[in-house]
């Protein structure tokens, strides 16, 4: 999503809640940023959809309820009660709790449920230690900003009563008495109104603006010089029509030399008068020098006292306002309009649209709806915007720039196949007799659309020179047919107000000349809410009295936008609202009006007007047909009237039930050709036989209230509003059906494509210009219509259409929420499918590795009956392979964790019943079982290799010790003639070997070695190594026994004897004889003496020690003997010692261990002769059976 468009949408929503936004923006945006970081993790789109849109609805509801108590008043602070100028009353984020004191509280809008918010009251708890949060029930929203509401809160509150409300501004947090907040200030509190005579002789009330310069009367002819700005007050009603939407227009600082107007409610723009409410000027605007730039706003009241009997209008009078504001860029959300170079007018900027007229011969002002970054090259600037109204003006330029963030190519959803087009109109210059219209055509689905720059270059600019920065808003989907100024498509864009849109884009509006010389707004049909059906054209005015061509009436229901403004207001035909005695609507046609002679009053135009009037009544009334009353009492013949009636009856035979001619039949002789029943009435008394007198309007001398100008203005605003609502409803309904179709079949790619398409569809719908306009200003338009309908309550047609508008508005509002819900559900399911697909792909990758490369490596590196060197090589390779196994295992565990989290999240969202999720759950369980089994197999194989490697090392160590013992025995046998003395080298070597036998090769290590062999996964693996080690151990015992036989006094230290004794199993109750123990005690003392002598003979450098071991490893020189003498065994001096040695070298026969036995511990020697490796440190156990 475009970040700039998202920012624009958020700022637009905040600006509507907290006007003036340039004053409240620092505070409000600070709260928004805190809320984004704390609750939405910086996700602006979720903040907009889940919080800001519901919060905007709630705040508007509270504001409307609060303002409804003060009707007929104009609020000084337009943001009341949500804010007071720059002080924010209703907060979006929590305040610092340390700022709360007893009696203080503040109001905050908080998230409640999914895409729902509620308002809470926060204050200190009774113990003053924490912040107490009190949700405000929805039923109390209409009473919040009243003193009674706080009294009710205090009655239920324990502790000190609440009386101060915390408000936030750029200067900090300030407590304000609640009574001050609930008592709004009004513009009525001002000096008396000054009346200044106007050029028409009427008087106009003028506010005293407290400016430094005296007031100057306005000169009606001075259009280009210094003008005036003032507040015009409605004399008839004594108020501006803005019951529900206060703060109609305010003055805000603009760039240097400009004055910016802005409206936050358009309810005051009823057609009974044109008003500009000028509120308090900032201090910097007062007392400026006369040379400062000025802003001129001219308003002309078109209707006279006779046309508007209930409103006394007057031209705008005022004075020049000097501007001395600081230079700088306008605040966010402000729409600026600038004068092109050489236009001779001062620039102005405005944030609302309002009609501005001025009567002048040969030249009229043009109303230009403001767009973002729109230059308005007109003589008179329109500094305000609001409800768009039809005006009587000359055609003029309407040039717009492409809205920010609009993509070059955008596909719009449409309820049905249609095309939309919009002419781009441009002014040819001040001297041209008529506006020259140039159009650019683009193709929908074929060819290439023209760029906005091309459109700018190809369109004429004001005064022959382009305005700086002037561009058109040109959408690629538009298809613009060739339209002449006389046949320009008449479309009408209406302001709307509702939820904040996703994209703050506006429909492109332009001026098209009407057939009667007036100017009507045209809306580019770039979206599905385009007002005009495709291919619709209306011919220009034909000759008066000409025949009616039926093909001109062959289109669908006529629209009021297609009718000429002068024809509507002429009064030649009207629907006063009365009913005859049968209940048929009364259609009054007057032949006495001078408009029949006008060139724009053609037969086709009259037929179109009558056709439209026949479509206005309610459906049940139209079924009865209309009663047409032709007032021809003055006897004027109108032959075109009969042709018009024939035309509408040819298209809709049941539209006219009966025709009553009030006057002489000779006045309209062709009535007999009409298919409907025709009756001639010569007097009003005869008319009362058909229509009750109370249902007759004033034109037929009846009391029924009817004001034609008000009726026309009401339907000019209502009909386009209804059209836009119907088209928006169709658009939303089609979108909802599209989202409710369900997920398409297919894999991850199809789900990804559908996900992207759904997001684009949702984005396109929410960016639709018509829907955006309804969201922005629909509520305001509806409120304005309700206000204007108060004077037409007697007309049932007005009541029924207003009820339909309210119902359609609520329907669109509900459909918008349904669309968001359906979109969220579909997007959630599609995102789930995509995530599941990615997880399944990753799981398959791990599974394929285990089934392929992993299994092959396990088989290739399996332990076999090989030599020690091969085992060491295989073990090293397997260690590298096991690193890959561990990495795959960790990845598999991470995937399983993600799957579990995804399942838990969907279970919390109620999506556990989805078939994709159920199938993935079974896949994930099978994968986890395979992963565990594979990892356990690798662990077991790694353990087997390590055990086998340790067995080979232990066997090799024992073989080396066996060779040492053989060497010792050989040396002893060679020197048997000379008996070894207790202190010679051979004796010491024997002493060391006996010590090693007792420590390094004891019985427990041999038993542990046997258990390790039994623990291997393959039967018979390592058995040969074990048997060889056992054989070497027995041979070592035999060799050492023979070596002891050559020693005259083989004394062994008592400590070594104890170790050897503990190393072999001793039968229960068996022990050494007492005399033997005493002998070994003496031997221990001799051994210690020998050790002392041995240690004293060693040199510090170790040189003598190395020579001694060299002698021990080689036989003594001169030592020799016969083989027989070697084989002979010398007699031991003591039989007790012989029994002890026999017990020392006796080998316990170990039972064979079963294959299922597992080692429990022990230690054996590793490589070398001095180091030991604990068996408990080796991985002889397997991983758990399950994860």
UniProtKB/Swiss-Prot annotation:
Gene3D superfamilies: 1.20.58.60
Compositional bias ranges of the Basic residues kind: 352-361
Disulfide bonds: none
Span list, region Disordered: 302-405, 419-451, 511-551, 1095-1134, 1148-1187
InterPro entries the record matches: Rho_GEF_signaling-related
Polar residues: bias regions: 1096-1107
Sequence ranges of Low complexity compositional bias: 321-333, 422-435, 517-534, 1160-1174
Protein's name in the database: Uncharacterized protein KIAA1755 homolog
Organism: Mus musculus (Mouse)
Organism placement in taxonomy: Eukaryota, Metazoa, Chordata, Craniata, Vertebrata
């Amino acid at each position: 999503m475009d970040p700039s468009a998202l920012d624009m949408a958020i700022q637009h929503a905040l600006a509507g809640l907290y006007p003036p936004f340039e004053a409240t923006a620092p505070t409000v945006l600070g709260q928004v940023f805190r809320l984004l970081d704390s609750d939405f993790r910086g996700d602006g789109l979720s903040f907009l959809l889940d919080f800001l849109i519901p919060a905007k609805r709630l705040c508007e509801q509270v504001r409307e309820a609060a303002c409804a108590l003060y009707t007929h008043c104009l609020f000084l602070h337009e943001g009341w009660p949500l804010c007071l100028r720059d002080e924010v009353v209703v907060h979006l984020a929590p305040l610092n709790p340390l700022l709360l004191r007893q009696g203080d509280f503040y109001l905050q809008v908080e998230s409640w449920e999914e895409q729902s918010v509620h308002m809470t009251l926060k204050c200190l708890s009774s113990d003053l230690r924490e912040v107490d949060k009190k949700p405000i029930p929805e039923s109390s929203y209409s009473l919040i900003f009243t003193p009674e509401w706080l009294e009710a809160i205090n009655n239920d509150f324990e502790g000190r009563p609440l009386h101060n409300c915390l408000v936030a501004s750029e200067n900090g947090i300030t407590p304000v008495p609640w009574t001050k907040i609930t008592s709004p200030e009004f513009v009525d509190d001002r000096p008396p109104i000054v009346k200044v005579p106007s050029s028409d002789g009427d008087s106009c009330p003028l506010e005293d603006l407290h400016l430094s310069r005296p007031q100057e009367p306005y000169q009606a002819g001075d259009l280009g010089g210094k003008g005036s700005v003032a507040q015009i007050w409605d004399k008839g009603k004594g108020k501006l029509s803005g019951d529900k939407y206060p703060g109609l227009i305010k003055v805000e600082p603009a760039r240097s030399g400009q004055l910016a107007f802005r409206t936050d409610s358009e309810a005051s723009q009823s057609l009974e008068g044109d008003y500009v409410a000028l509120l308090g000027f900032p201090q910097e605007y007062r007392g400026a020098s006369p040379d400062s730039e000025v802003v001129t706003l001219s308003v002309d009241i078109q209707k006279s006292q006779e046309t508007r009997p209930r409103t006394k209008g007057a031209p705008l009078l005022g004075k020049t306002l000097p501007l001395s504001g600081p230079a700088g860029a306008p605040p966010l959300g402000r729409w600026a309009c600038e004068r092109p170079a050489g236009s001779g007018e001062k620039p102005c900027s405005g944030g609302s649209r309002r009609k501005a007229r001025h009567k002048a011969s040969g030249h009229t002002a043009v109303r230009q709806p403001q767009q973002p970054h729109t230059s308005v090259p007109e003589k008179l600037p329109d500094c305000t915007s609001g409800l768009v109204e039809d005006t009587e003006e000359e055609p003029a330029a309407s040039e717009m720039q492409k809205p920010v963030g609009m993509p070059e190519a955008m596909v719009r959803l449409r309820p049905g196949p249609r095309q939309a087009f919009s002419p781009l109109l441009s002014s040819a210059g001040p001297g041209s007799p008529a506006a020259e219209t140039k159009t650019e055509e683009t193709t929908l689905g074929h060819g290439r659309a023209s760029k906005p720059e091309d459109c700018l270059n190809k369109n004429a600019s004001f005064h022959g020179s382009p305005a700086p920065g002037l561009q058109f808003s040109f959408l690629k989907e538009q298809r613009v047919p060739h339209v002449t100024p006389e046949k320009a498509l008449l479309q009408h864009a209406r302001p709307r107000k509702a939820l904040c849109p996703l994209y703050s884009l506006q429909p492109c509006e332009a001026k098209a000349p009407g057939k009667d010389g007036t100017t009507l707004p045209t809306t580019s049909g770039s979206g599905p809410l385009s007002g005009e059906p495709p291919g619709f054209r209306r011919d220009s005015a034909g000759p008066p009295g000409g025949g009616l061509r039926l093909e001109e009436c062959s289109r669908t229901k006529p629209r009021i936008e297609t009718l000429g403004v002068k024809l509507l207001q002429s009064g030649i035909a009207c629907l006063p609202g009365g009913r005859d005695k049968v209940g048929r609507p009364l259609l009054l046609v007057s032949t006495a009006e001078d408009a029949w002679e006008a060139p724009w009053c053609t037969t086709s135009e009259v037929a179109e007007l009558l056709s439209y009037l026949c479509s206005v009544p309610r459906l049940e009334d139209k079924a009865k047909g209309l009663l047409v009353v032709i007032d021809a009492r003055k006897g004027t013949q109108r032959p075109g009237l009969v042709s018009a009636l024939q035309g509408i009856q040819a298209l809709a035979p049941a539209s006219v039930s009966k025709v009553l001619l009030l006057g002489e039949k000779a006045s309209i002789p062709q009535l007999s050709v009409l298919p409907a029943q025709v009756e001639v009435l010569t007097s009003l008394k005869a008319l009362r036989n058909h229509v009750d007198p109370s249902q007759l309007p004033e034109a037929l001398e009846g009391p029924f209230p009817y004001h034609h100008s008000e009726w026309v203005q009401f339907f000019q605003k209502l009909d386009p509003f209804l059209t836009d609502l119907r088209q928006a409803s169709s658009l939303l309904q089609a979108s909802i059906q599209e989202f409710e179709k369900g997920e398409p079949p297919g894999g991850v790619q199809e789900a990804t494509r559908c996900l992207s398409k759904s997001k684009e569809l949702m984005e396109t719908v929410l960016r639709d210009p018509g829907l955006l306009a309804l969201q922005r200003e629909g509520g305001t338009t509806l409120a304005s219509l309700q206000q204007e309908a108060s004077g037409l309550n007697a007309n049932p047609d007005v009541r029924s259409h207003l009820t339909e508008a309210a119902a359609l508005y609520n329907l669109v509002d509900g459909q918008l929420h349904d669309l968001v819900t359906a979109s969220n559900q579909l997007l959630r399911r599609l995102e789930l499918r995509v995530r599941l697909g990615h997880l399944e792909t990753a799981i398959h990758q791990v599974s394929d590795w285990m089934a392929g490369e992993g299994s092959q490596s396990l088989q290739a590196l399996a332990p076999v009956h090989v030599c020690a060197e091969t085992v060491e090589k295989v073990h090293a390779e397997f260690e590298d392979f096991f690193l890959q196994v561990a990495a795959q295992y960790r990845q598999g565990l991470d995937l399983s964790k993600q799957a579990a989290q995804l399942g838990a999240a969907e279970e919390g969202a109620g999506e556990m019943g989805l078939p994709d999720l159920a199938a993935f759950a079974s896949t994930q369980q099978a994968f986890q079982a395979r992963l565990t089994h594979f990892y356990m197999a690798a662990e077991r194989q790694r353990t087997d290799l390590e055990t086998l490697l340790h067995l080979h090392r232990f066997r090799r160590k024992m073989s080396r010790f066996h060779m040492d013992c053989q060497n010792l025995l050989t040396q002893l046998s060679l020197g048997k003639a000379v008996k070894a003395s207790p202190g010679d080298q051979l004796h010491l070597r024997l002493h060391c070997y006996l010590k090693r036998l007792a420590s390094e090769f004891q019985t427990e290590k041999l038993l542990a070695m046997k258990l390790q062999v039994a623990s291997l996964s393959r039967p018979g693996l390592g058995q040969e190594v074990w048997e060889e080690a056992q054989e070497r151990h027995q041979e070592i015992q035999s060799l050492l026994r023979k070596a002891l036989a050559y020693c005259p006094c083989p004394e062994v230290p008592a400590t070594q004897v104890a170790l050897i004794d503990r190393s072999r199993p001793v039968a229960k109750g068996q022990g050494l004889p007492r005399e033997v123990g005493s002998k070994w005690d003496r031997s221990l003392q001799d051994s210690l003496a020998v050790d002392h002598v041995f240690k004293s003979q060693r040199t510090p450098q170790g040189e003598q020690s190395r020579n001694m071991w060299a002698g021990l490893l080689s036989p003594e020189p001169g030592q020799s003997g016969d083989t027989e003498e070697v084989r002979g065994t010398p007699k031991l001096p003591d039989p007790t010692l012989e029994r002890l040695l026999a017990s020392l070298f006796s080998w316990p026969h170990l039972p064979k261990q079963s294959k299922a036995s597992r080692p429990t511990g022990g230690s054996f020697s590793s490589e070398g002769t001095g180091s030991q490796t604990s068996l408990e440190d080796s991985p002889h156990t397997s991983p758990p059976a399950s994860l």
